[in-house]
Amino acid sequence: LAALPTVMELKSHFDGADVLVVSPGPSLKQDLELLSEVQDQFLIFASVKALSALFDAGIKPDLAIWQDPRDHSHAIPDRPEIAEVGLVLSEGCHPAFFGANFATHFPYPDPGFVGTELSAALHGGDAPKLGGTSVSTLSAVMALGFNARSVTLLGQDLSIGGGLYVSGGS
């Protein structure tokens, strides 16, 4: 972890930006065409599970995010495009995510350790508590904590009965 850049290094990218948080809900499919036309107007922060759908539509997210500590390496797209996208991830994510071929990896401070010497050594003394029960919640909290001008959510309908991820998987 000490050899990786911290998510705190991204703060200036969020400051004053219009952030689009993209999740892989089935409604994302209807927004892909419009998103491809306006993608340059947003900092696009996407769930790893939304990446393939975005790449297929010609959309290049600025950042991807993952927070689950379990081995979900099957969720990492086997696509060359990930080499151009930075990955924001929990300090406790499975090693497969740290080893994936993303442009770089930006661990975020574990809320339970913020304020400790370990957190200060990894992220500096002013790291905010970044938390959320889903990657979309965490992404929105992070964007707002880093002074984004606005946060817009797409593809957030994962709890609708019968809905599948836009990539077609479960």
Describe the function of each predicted region.
Residues 1-22, 26-43, 52-57, 72-85, ...:
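N-terminal donor/sugar-recognition subdomains of glycan-related enzymes
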Residues 95-158:
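Active-site/ligand-binding-proximal alpha/beta "capping" segment
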Residues 65-71, 76-85, 106-110, 166-170:
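Acidic, Ser/Thr-rich peripheral helices and adjacent loops at domain boundaries
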Residues 19-23, 44-46, 65, 88, ...:
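Structural motif
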Residues 48-51, 66-73, 90-94, 110-114, ...:
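Short, acidic/turn-prone active-site loops that include or flank metal/cofactor-
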